[in-house]
């Protein structure tokens, strides 16, 4: 079922002073906001534009999942949040809702709303976790630690909701060994689905300045390209529990926004084919390095 990325216009506590100012060092909202979300319009209008957008590219469907991607989509008062969620779920072609948010922006009151909606709709929460290492989270000005993510995931799963996590591969200070070792902590979260994507350095971000000042702290510097990333992703998959569905391995953003992207313009579907081919060559599968089979 096709997901429709939408923008509810909500901000982030790491930008407005709720947690901090300036946002995460790597973040540029424009990089993952589809063109049909720009220029305003109600959520219902965005949905219609999104459906037309995908139909024009041959992606037809009877029903869709609304995906609140941009911003922190639990960061408002409960009345506003209920209005947003119900507007999306009332669309005749929407069969479910995925809410992207931060692990420090969930409460019992919000979980009550989501649990109630889940009785008649598919509801999932996707947390931007980004790293399992507190030193990294602090360095990128994330505004929360990994324990916060552990707690948020556990509370959300206790309500019977599907929970996903988003992680960035290649944040400063993390080696290949750190990334693979961190999969043990990810597995302990017992996520229903997961997204990985490579660090892309966006123009005008704080991390762009950091990259130019000390690129040796980034694994994507010094010749780490598509072959090396393919091998790393295959190793991640082999250490990842097969009970967690992988939704993404690579991101793609408009080129004019990117200052540095070591993987060039390879598309996610092309990269997925490359990874599957490499795993086949290795006679490998998800979780085989940890001896876990899918339930």
Where are these regions (language model features)?
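Core AdoMet radical
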Residues: 30-50, 54-78, 93-106, 122-149, ...
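Auxiliary Fe-S-binding modules of radical SAM enzymes
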Residues: 1-2, 201-295
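Canonical Radical SAM [4Fe-4S] cluster-binding loop centered on the CxxxCxxC motif
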Residues: 1-45
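Distinct, well-ordered alpha-helical segments
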Residues: 78-86, 107-116, 177-179
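Structural recognition of alpha->loop->beta junctions
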Residues: 24, 89-94, 181-196, 269-286
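Conserved C-terminal portion of the radical SAM core fold
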Residues: 147-207, 227-249
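Hydrophobic faces of well-ordered beta-strands that scaffold small-molecule active sites
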Residues: 2-6, 64-66, 97-99, 123-127, ...
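Acidic (Asp/Glu)-rich catalytic clusters
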Residues: 54-58, 85-92, 112-122, 154-158
């Amino acid at each position: 079922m096709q997901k429709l990325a939408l923008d509810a216009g909500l901000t982030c506590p790491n930008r407005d002073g709720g947690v901090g100012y300036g946002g995460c060092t790597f973040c540029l909202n424009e990089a993952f906001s589809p063109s049909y979300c720009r220029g305003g319009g109600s959520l219902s209008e965005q949905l219609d534009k999104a459906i037309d957008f995908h139909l024009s590219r041959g992606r037809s469907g009877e029903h869709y999942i609304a995906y609140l991607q941009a911003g922190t989509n639990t960061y408002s008062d409960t009345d506003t949040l209920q209005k947003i969620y119900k507007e999306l779920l009332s669309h005749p072609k929407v069969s479910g809702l995925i809410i992207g948010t931060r692990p420090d922006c969930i409460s019992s009151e919000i979980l009550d709303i989501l649990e109630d909606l889940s009785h008649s709709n598919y509801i999932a929460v996707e947390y931007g976790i980004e790293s399992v290492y507190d030193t990294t989270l602090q360095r990128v000005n994330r505004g929360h630690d990994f324990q916060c993510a552990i707690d948020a995931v556990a509370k959300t799963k206790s309500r019977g909701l599907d929970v996903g996590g988003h992680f960035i591969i290649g944040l400063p200070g993390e080696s290949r060994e750190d990334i693979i070792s961190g999969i043990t902590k990810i597995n302990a979260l017992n996520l229903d689905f997961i997204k990985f994507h490579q660090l892309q350095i966006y123009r005008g971000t704080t991390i762009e300045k950091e990259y130019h000042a000390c690129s040796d702290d980034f694994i994507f510097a010094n010749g780490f390209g598509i072959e090396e990333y393919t091998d790393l992703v295959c190793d991640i998959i082999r250490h990842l529990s097969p009970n967690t569905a992988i939704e993404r391995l690579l991101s793609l953003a408009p080129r004019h926004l990117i200052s540095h992207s070591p993987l060039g313009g390879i598309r996610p579907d092309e990269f997925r084919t490359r990874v599957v081919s490499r795993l086949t060559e290795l006679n490998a599968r998800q979780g085989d390095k940890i001896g876990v089979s899918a339930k």
